[in-house]
């Protein structure tokens, strides 16, 4: 894959992009998007530094098909392009970024292989939840923060950080 040229200025300029893969997140419950309860105060405080997408939907109801479509630029109505298209991470690597994948998803459960396939396109991968039963895993997404802070604090100038949340995957019991 040939290097991707920057279209927006000096390619030597330091840049950091953070992509949140928000499992089971519903924007209707995020105050950043107008929800009446104060659920995202830290994001709201830095709103001017963010690119907040207002009109985005998940292309599927399950993680792997959604990631295939989003990370491979697949069109909603067309077939899978996993064997023919480079992923977003591959393109970012080609553009000179150091890519990171930080996940709170359980890596040792059935179905985790599909997520790992995308994660392995990153130059550095960290799966922090080693549970064997995702339904019983109580691993809050805050466990990702120390790893994120470490990456943000390193000397790499051009970073693309993918953060894969556990979100609302926890088992609920009365």
Feature locations, PLM:
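Active-site-proximal alpha/beta segments of enzymes that process anionic O-linked groups
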Residues: 1-19, 24-174
């Amino acid at each position: 894959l040939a290097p991707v040229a920057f279209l927006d200025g000096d390619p030597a300029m330091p840049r950091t992009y953070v992509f949140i893969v928000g499992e089971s997140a519903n924007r209707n419950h995020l105050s950043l998007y107008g929800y009446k309860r104060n659920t995202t105060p830290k994001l709201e405080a830095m709103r001017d530094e963010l690119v907040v997408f207002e009109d985005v939907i998940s292309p599927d109801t399950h993680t792997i098909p959604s990631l295939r479509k989003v990370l491979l630029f697949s069109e909603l109505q067309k077939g899978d392009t996993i064997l023919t298209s480079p992923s977003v991470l591959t393109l970012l690597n080609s553009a000179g970024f150091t890519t990171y994948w930080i996940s709170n998803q359980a890596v040792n459960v059935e179905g985790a292989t599909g997520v790992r396939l995308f994660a392995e396109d990153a130059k550095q991968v960290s799966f922090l939840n080693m549970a064997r039963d995702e339904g019983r895993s109580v691993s809050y997404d805050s466990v990702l923060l120390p790893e994120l802070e470490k990456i943000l604090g390193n000397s790499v100038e051009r970073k693309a950080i993918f953060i894969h949340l556990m979100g609302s995957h926890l088992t609920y019991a009365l």
